[in-house]
Amino acid sequence: VDNNYSKKYLFEATPDIAKQMKALLKDAIQNKNEMVDGIFLTHAHIGHYSGLMYLGKEAANAKNVNVFAMPRMKKYLETNGPWSQLVTNKNISLTQIEKEQSIFLTPNLMATPFLVPHRDEYSETVGYRIKGPNKTALFIPDIDKWNKWDKSIVEEIKKVDYAFLDATFYSGKEINNRDISQIPHPFVIESLEMFKTLDSIERKKVIFITTIKVLYTSTIMCSFFSFICHVS
């Protein structure tokens, strides 16, 4: 939420998109329109883009909501129903973004996508660096494993004020007998071990997201898919 310029943006269109938008509305001082000014997508997996369906004619019947997507993600939405209907009916307006190219949303707010390794059956997978006038955030809701990324997550945490990171699975026990190579994510217990090298100030930056089990574990900081914050 950038109240200085009356703008609201959402990162991820989850199945709970209506709740996400209502939550953003609570922080908006001037812009009381429930619909956001734009939605940033990371990839084409169910929990990250399926909320777009609620912008269609059977639901909100939105008008040209700006949806920011990477090239493969954009093409996927344009060429596969029911998502293509959102484009045809002008419920959404797709804006193609590119890796490492910043999008200036307001004079106070900038988002920069970057590629991360993940199951890319239908689209690329990206995270975002989000920069306000005073603080920055790292947003990586899904990634295969931290050591498969060409950057050090520990070093990237040090560069920002907040780090919203993948915590889909707490440990292997959570997925029983399923092959983790088919649904790869960094286990929370692996992340905690890796982040031990960070000092207490750096560790406090980490907020685990895309989580079920951790959400109810009071000893670990956690949040939901999308985060809500004032531009600062």
What role is predicted for each listed range?
Residues 1-26, 30, 94-156:
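Core dinuclear metal-dependent hydrolase active-site scaffold
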Residues 6-68, 161:
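Active-site metal-binding motif and surrounding structural segment of the metallo-beta-lactamase
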Residues 19, 26-29, 100-101, 215-232:
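Short, electropositive alpha-helical surface patch
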Residues 31-34, 57-63, 86-88, 154-159, ...:
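Short, conserved loop/helix-junction motifs that constitute active-site signature segments
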Residues 36, 89-91, 160-161, 167:
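Short, well-ordered alpha-helix to beta-strand connector turns
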Residues 67-69, 138-139, 208:
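Structural beta-sheet core signal
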Residues 72-82:
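A short, active-site helix/loop in glycosyltransferases that binds the activated sugar's phosphate group
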Residues 136, 144-228:
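Cap/insert and terminal regions of metallo-dependent hydrolase folds
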